[in-house]
A protein has these predicted regions:
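Active-site histidine-anchored catalytic micro-motif
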Residues: 1-160
Length: 160
């Protein structure tokens, strides 16, 4: 089963930047997390962007959409910052014949207490099992793109 993985940045890829505790988006964590999960066959990981999702714009979403639409894999996993993940998921709707799953993390993937490995594992399963469509995976759930929002007050995703 062919799966494409695209990375766009976000907290999942963040690293400490300076002594003040500021972060910046570093190299993608996906491959490292999948190696730790002991996957037998790790798909190629393509870095599209290295941005905090709050810095993403419509041009970035179009770049992601084009990459997803033009890749030959019927199943696509996209790592993304959580703040604007839903907006990007909605921008990917309408791409036919593909199962597209977006996931990210609320804590950097390099942190031991991060939700990154769990979210990525669930997303990897979802991309293989869900029918064609666009989904957001977070907080132990798989949400259809048109039925999810991020509750900023609770810092979690929920069904709408």
């Amino acid at each position: 089963m062919k799966i494409a993985i695209f990375t766009t940045g976000g907290t999942i890829d963040k690293v400490y930047f300076d002594a003040k505790g500021a972060y910046h988006v570093g190299a993608p964590m996906v491959r490292e997390l999948l190696v730790h999960a002991r996957l037998e066959d790790i798909p190629e990981v393509v870095e599209l962007l290295r941005k905090d999702s709050l810095e993403m714009n419509d041009d970035d979403r179009q770049l992601i959409r084009t990459a997803v639409a033009e890749c030959d894999a019927p199943r696509v996993l996209v790592t993304h910052g959580t703040d604007t993940m839903v907006a990007t998921a909605k921008a990917l709707q309408g791409i036919g014949g593909k199962t597209i799953v977006l996931t990210g993390a609320l804590q950097p993937g390099r942190f031991a207490d991060s939700d990154a490995a769990f979210n990525l594992g669930l997303a990897f399963g979802a991309v293989q099992l869900c029918p064609p469509g666009v989904y957001v995976v977070a907080n132990g759930a798989v949400f259809p793109a048109d039925k999810v929002r991020k509750n900023l007050e609770l810092n979690r995703f929920e069904t709408v």
